[in-house]
């Protein structure tokens, strides 16, 4: 990245740091784990030699160069538990995020803690305007992680990724710097009262745009579906 270093970066429980060759065996071990690799696109098996090449290829860097990618180690109490992938476009203003976590540490909140800290640092100190992420549509846990960080679902690319010999769909999410503060400062308490109001021509457009998280749509009907049910019972 530019002159200022991105790493190391500390969170309440984690240290985000550059990889070292001492991490190669651990990186290879969890990247070969079927539970970790299931929704990822790296070649399998992910050998120690492949891990060493990845680490050596970014030696001396503390973050991605413009137009490149960089793997960030997620360290918990001196132990490698996963990694973040960070890509930057040529302008340095558009970032792409990826993440993977050891299967025995999934469900710990480490991935969202690490990704959230990285995103905040990119927005606050490095002039990044937008962070994007893509995922396998079947990876509901990853979609929920992005939703918890404030990402917005932007659509599905049909057969847009060639993964291990097959064309696959991917779901696309993004978060703007302008939206991050609003998300972090949103109200977490239930409203004191709820009022039912008539839908009128003046408010219909706003009502129609109401939505829930993508992963909750099978529990909560969309507004277009609700309108259709009311009009055509």
Segments predicted by a language model, with ranges:
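Acetyl-CoA-dependent GNAT
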Residues: 46-98, 102-104, 198-233
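Acyl-donor (CoA/ACP) binding surface of acyl/acetyltransferases
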Residues: 1-39, 71-197, 202
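Short histidine-centered catalytic/ligand-binding loop motif
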Residues: 40-44
């Amino acid at each position: 990245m530019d002159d200022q270093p991105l790493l190391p970066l500390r969170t309440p429980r984690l240290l985000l740091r550059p990889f070292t060759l001492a991490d190669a065996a651990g990186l290879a071990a969890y990247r070969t784990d079927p539970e970790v690799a299931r929704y990822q696109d790296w070649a399998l098996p992910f050998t120690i030699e492949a891990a060493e090449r990845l680490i050596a290829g970014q030696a001396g860097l503390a973050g991605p160069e413009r137009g490149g990618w960089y793997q960030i180690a997620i360290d918990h109490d001196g132990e490698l538990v996963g990694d973040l992938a960070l890509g930057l476009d040529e302008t340095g203003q558009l970032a792409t995020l990826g993440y993977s976590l050891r299967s025995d540490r999934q469900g710990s909140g480490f991935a969202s803690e690490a990704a959230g800290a990285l995103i905040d640092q990119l927005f606050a100190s490095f002039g990044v305007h937008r962070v994007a992420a893509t995922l396998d549509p079947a990876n509901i846990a990853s979609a929920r992680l992005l939703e918890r960080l404030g990402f917005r679902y932007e659509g599905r690319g049909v057969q847009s990724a060639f993964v291990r010999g097959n064309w696959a769909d991917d779901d696309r999410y993004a978060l703007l710097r302008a939206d991050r503060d609003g998300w972090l400062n949103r109200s977490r308490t239930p409203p004191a009262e709820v009022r039912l109001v008539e839908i009128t021509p003046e408010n219909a457009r706003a009502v129609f745009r109401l939505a829930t998280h993508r992963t909750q749509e099978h529990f909560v009907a969309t507004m277009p579906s609700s309108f259709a049910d009311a009009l055509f019972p």
